[in-house]
Amino acid sequence: MSFETKPNYLLLTNPDTPLSVCTSPYYSPSGKTASIPSSEASKPEGTNGQWSHLPTGATYVTDEFSSEFQIQNGSTAAQSGNANNYADPLSHRRYFNNVNGYNHHQFYDTASQASVSSPATSVTSSLSPPDSLSNGHTTQRHHIGKAISFCKVCGDKASGYHYGVTSCEGCKGFFRRSIQRKIDYRCLKQQVCEIKRESRNRCQYCRFKKCLDSGMSKDSVRQMKFRNAMRDDKSPDSVFVPEISTLERQEEVDAVYEAVLRAHTTFSFYTDIKIRSIVARPFNVRINEDSKMNRLNAWQIYAHEIDVDIKEVVNFVKEIPKFNFINGNDKAVLLRKNAFPLYLLRIVRGMSNRGLMLRDGRLIDFKSLQLLYGSLADEMLAFANHIITIGCTDGDIALFIVLILCQPLTTEQQFSTNFKSQLQLLEMFDFYKKVLFQKMTCRIDGCDTYKQLMKCIHELNRLNELHKQQLNILRENLSFLNLPPLVVEMFQLSTLPLPVNHNNQENQYTPAPEHQSPQPQQPTPNQQQTPVHC
């Protein structure tokens, strides 16, 4: 609708007539009424009408305005100084009111500063009046610029959010170089230098200190450096850094992590807290002149300790989130394939130069450990020391155990074991790799630890092959041993000895029937059965 002439509006000759719209205390241009009329007290809320005055002093009420209207030249409202403006007779300020349905109550100190704005003008145009009143029909648009942010360190204009703080490019680069180069600064004064844009280069110690005080994170620099290195490294041994998708929310990652850590703490004797509370005591193994007898004797005793841990591994696997998507037969295949790597990861905190600490405090000295595993014992100790040295927590070890268990099988391994859950296994492996990455990179030096831990996958698989070779002596003498059936099954001891030189990571095997111990073979007349001393 448009403001044309007086007949288009309902005239209210009596200003005290009750109005159905919001009124103002200074509605009369003649200034004869300086108080708030009684009609304001009875105004209803939520109406869209307007009110104004004619030069004669008569009050009129407009209809509910539409989204667009124009003030035309020559109209009564425009000639009277724009129907959307009214003057304060006391302060001589002119108020700008009701543009496009909004009541801004914008005012100017003098009438000459008031603008005649087209109703089609945006709201921001009313805040910036034009220099002249003559151009009443020209639409003027003024845009509010983006707010300028300043560097929290030096006060210069910020370029973005860097390393956890709004900062400029100069302080961003300075902080990154200081962390990557591990520079040790010194202050020549009292470490209270003022850091401003003009003086930020005078004292690097105080500037670096203010970067840290402002909230810049050293870990953010290390994580960025690690990601860039992984992106640029195209070698086969490079570590893949997974990206956390939006579907794997932080809540899900935390829930999975807590479930795995809780299961590991419940079904492991070698957590950080438990191993510290164990009191060591000697574990005697009877030593004879025959080295073969000694080794078989040691395994006869040691196998029962492994049997207990294998049962705990099975209980741990039952609590792994998402592992129920894999059928029971395929779970057994994965456990048999990775039995030794899982066992080694679980006992890393129990191994030392002294030997292996058992769950009840008995200590298998390192000499006896070499009797059991041969040269593999030295590599087991080196691997355990490496895991502890790089700073793996119980949570890291628990997630890494799941990751090793979920390693995808080769095509040959799938065929030989009739494995059916390869797709589900790939999804689980990728998921737990992302969970492990996210949890480890949240702490200082977590990126470097993650990178080193991923390289341990290849080392674990290599040790697994060496372990299979070391157990050939048990396969050859299985008829003379009374080993727990679960140990025989998990380590595949009922098959023929494995060749030393082979290319496959795992040879074909025929699992022994569960819950049945292997039948002892009758010795030939030329052989004499050797008793086993426990």
Swiss-Prot record:
Keywords: Differentiation, DNA-binding, Metal-binding, Nucleus, Receptor, Sexual differentiation, Transcription, Transcription regulation, Zinc, Zinc-finger
Gene Ontology molecular function, alphabetical: DNA-binding transcription factor activity; nuclear receptor activity; RNA polymerase II cis-regulatory region sequence-specific DNA binding; RNA polymerase II transcription regulatory region sequence-specific DNA binding; zinc ion binding
Pfam families: zf-C4
Gene knockout outcome: RNAi-mediated knockdown results in 43% lethality of hermaphrodites. RNAi-mediated knockdown together with fox-1 results in hermaphrodite embryonic lethality. This hermaphrodite-specific lethality is suppressed in a sea-2 bp283 mutant or sea-1 gk799 mutant background. RNAi-mediated knockdown results in hermaphrodites lethality due to failure of the dosage compensation complex to assemble on X chromosomes in a fox-1 y303 mutant background. RNAi-mediated knockdown in a background containing one copy of the fox-1 gene results in the viability of 3% of hermaphrodites.
GO BP terms: cell differentiation; dosage compensation by hypoactivation of X chromosome; hormone-mediated signaling pathway; intracellular receptor signaling pathway; negative regulation of transcription by RNA polymerase II; positive regulation of transcription by RNA polymerase II; primary sex determination; regulation of alternative mRNA splicing, via spliceosome
Zinc finger boundaries on the chain: NR C4-type: 151-171, 187-211
Low complexity: bias regions: 119-130, 511-534
Residue span(s) of domain NR LBD: 252-493
InterPro entries registered for this protein in UniProt: NHR-like_dom_sf, Nucl_hrmn_rcpt_lig-bd, Nuclear_hrmn_rcpt, Znf_hrmn_rcpt, Znf_NHR/GATA
Tissue expression notes: Most abundant in embryos.
Transcription keyword on record: yes
Subcellular location field: Nucleus
GO cellular component term, pick one: nucleus
Sequence segments annotated as region (Disordered): 30-53, 119-139, 502-534
DNA-binding region: 148-223
SMART domains, alphabetized: HOLI (SM00430), ZnF_C4 (SM00399)
Function as written in the Swiss-Prot or TrEMBL entry: Transcriptional regulator which is involved in the sex determination and X chromosome dosage compensation pathways. Directly binds to five 5'-A(G/C)(G/T)(T/G)C(A/G)-3' sites in the promoter of sex-determining factor xol-1 to negatively regulate its expression and promote hermaphrodite development. Together with fox-1 is involved in making the distinction between one and two X-chromosomes. Plays a role in the fox-1-mediated repression of the functionally active isoform (isoform b) of the sex-determining factor xol-1 gene to promote hermaphrodite development.
Family in the record: Belongs to the nuclear hormone receptor family. NR1 subfamily.
Protein's recorded name: Steroid hormone receptor family member cnr14
Organism field: Caenorhabditis elegans
Gene behind this protein: sex-1
